[in-house]
Amino acid sequence: MTPAETQKFDSLSVSVALAQLNPHLGDVSANCQKLLQMRERAAAKGADIILTPEMFLAGYPADDLVLRADFMDRIEAAISRLAKATADGGPAIIVGAPCRDKEVLYNSAFILDGGKIVARRDKVNLPNYG
């Protein structure tokens, strides 16, 4: 890297709030509310991004809950609610949640900012407990 390129990175500052919250297994609404409350506190402290643990919205391990359509509907509604909350210009959210894409389920991280889902990244290397 040239000195000019290094200087460009030296001036970049991002404040990340780690959401070390205890999600309730299967209680999507409560987990969403916890995250929204934490986002308010993080915004007051100047955070740019909030990062949650893997599968935060569902709780971990979600096991067979992710096979229920009504549960996945609640997950999708919570992601939409969280995304809309980011329209206020406050911190972006990176939230871990299960994702239903047609008939396939993923363990994903959603990047929410500016009132929408900006990106989704699916976990590639899943644990093998067998």
What are these language model-derived features?
Residues 1-130:
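Hydrophobic structural segments
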